[in-house]
Amino acid sequence: MFRQSLRSIARTRTGTIGVRTYAEAVNPDVLKVSLVAPHQAIFTNKEVSQVNLPASSGEMGVLANHVPTVEELAPGVVEVIESSGTASKYFVSGGFASILPGSKLSISTVEAHPLDAFSSENIKSLLAEAQKNASSADETVAAEAAIEIEVLEALQAAVH
Amino acid sequence: ATLREIETRLKSIKNIEKITNTMKVVASTRMGRAQRAMASSRAFREGDSDFFATAETSTPETAEKTLIIAVSSDKGLCGSIHSQIAKATRAKLQETPNADVVTIGDKIKAQMLRTHSSNVVLSFNGVGKEAPTFWEASLIADEIRKLGDYDKIEVMYNKFVSGVAFEPSVFPSFSPISIEESPKLSEFELEEDQAIPTSLSQISLTNAILNAMAEGYASEISARRNAMDNASKNAGEMINKYSILYNRTRQAVITNELVDIITGASSLD
């Protein structure tokens, strides 16, 4: 008898706990961003107000409650604007941004570095070399150079 | 055994102890870096595993072509790391006898060739000396992609559980078709012209390989540290045993000589 009533209490308890879901536990009005490269996680679930992304279909700004989607990123600048208004800029070499339900944005990219870590002279000399290689007879070298030019030109535009 | 024999034995055990101890120290110093690499690759993988979890992507139950990628490394002396992966891969092959196998690392290659030589289609070596990089993982993924399309790809690796434990686990890698067929994909607004499923499937394979290699590396280093720690302890025990035996034998030899001398001297009286 006692055991039976215990069991029924246990059942009702689990019932009420089961209603509480993960999506309710987080505040959906704050955008949470993770910016990760394979060798380093720059942000993990950091609460920010806006993120600007260099999507391959064009620049896009992401705010909280954005519709879930997946975007391929072109080489360009990811701008993270914190709720205090300070913005930090990172250059990424392309990758993916997935916006998940619950205002969660995760950006995975192969390389990501702060914009002020780049030297404009280095970019110029590397770009000159890549442009020289782009007209190479070897198809692989030419294709690699074309990618290099795409990244370096985006980087040059971002640094200036 | 004679005194000389025990002496050489004792010396060689002492040398072995020095070697295992050094290997243990080397493994300990690498441990920190291996764990950092593993943590960042885990975080990197979360990006797309979150997406797959939300879209509820799953591998097809009945796959015509299955590929198993077994990730381990080239170096031994690290406990049961390689044989555990081989065992797990063999168990998978029991379920799907026609699956193709790609091996990463010489040790797992040797083990798979012994029992399932006809299934192994491609193997890599020279990885796992240092913490894996994205560059290595993408080169491997590129080669694997040249094998053709598979309905189901599974990456077998040693999951790093703690400093003393690891367990063979599986990362699924999804084909573009299974991504498109995900039941909850409609929650996302994907642009049709960008071929997102194809690129996502490619990056998720690279990601799975990178994460598997990083976890495997960390597990291997910690397993090696433990194996070498045990070996050093055992060597220490043997050194103690043999030192006692050596001293006893030396005593016995001296006593024997004394007995000889004294009996000789007393016989002269």
From Swiss-Prot, chain A:
Pfam families: ATP-synt_DE_N, ATPD_C_fung. Residues 1-22 form a transit peptide. The keyword Transport applies. It is a peripheral membrane protein. F-type ATP synthases have 2 components, the catalytic core F(1) and the membrane-embedded component F(0), linked together by a central stalk and a peripheral stalk. The central stalk, also called rotor shaft, is often seen as part of F(1). The peripheral stalk is seen as part of F(0). F(0) contains the membrane channel next to the rotor. F-type ATP synthases form dimers but each monomer functions independently in ATP generation. Belongs to the ATPase epsilon chain family. This is ATP synthase subunit delta, mitochondrial. It comes from Pichia angusta (Yeast). The lineage of its organism: Eukaryota, Fungi, Dikarya, Ascomycota, Saccharomycotina.
UniProtKB/Swiss-Prot annotation, chain B:
GO terms for cellular component: mitochondrial inner membrane; proton-transporting ATP synthase complex. Its main location: mitochondrion. Pfam families: ATP-synt. Keywords: ATP synthesis, CF(1), Hydrogen ion transport, Ion transport, Membrane, Mitochondrion, Mitochondrion inner membrane, Transport. It is found in: Mitochondrion inner membrane. GO terms for molecular function: proton-transporting ATP synthase activity, rotational mechanism. InterPro entries: ATP_synth_F1_ATPase_gsu, ATP_synth_F1_gsu, ATP_synth_F1_gsu_CS. Coiled coil: none annotated. Disulfide bonds: none annotated. Gene3D superfamilies: 3.40.1380.10, ATP synthase, gamma subunit, helix hairpin domain (1.10.287.80). It is a peripheral membrane protein. Belongs to the ATPase gamma chain family. Mitochondrial membrane ATP synthase (F(1)F(0) ATP synthase or Complex V) produces ATP from ADP in the presence of a proton gradient across the membrane which is generated by electron transport complexes of the respiratory chain. F-type ATP synthases consist of two structural domains, F(1) - containing the extramembraneous catalytic core, and F(0) - containing the membrane proton channel, linked together by a central stalk and a peripheral stalk. F-type ATP synthases have 2 components, the catalytic core F(1) and the membrane-embedded component F(0), linked together by a central stalk and a peripheral stalk. The central stalk, also called rotor shaft, is often seen as part of F(1). The peripheral stalk is seen as part of F(0). F(0) contains the membrane channel next to the rotor. F-type ATP synthases form dimers but each monomer functions independently in ATP generation. This is ATP synthase subunit gamma, mitochondrial. It comes from Pichia angusta. The gene is ATP3.
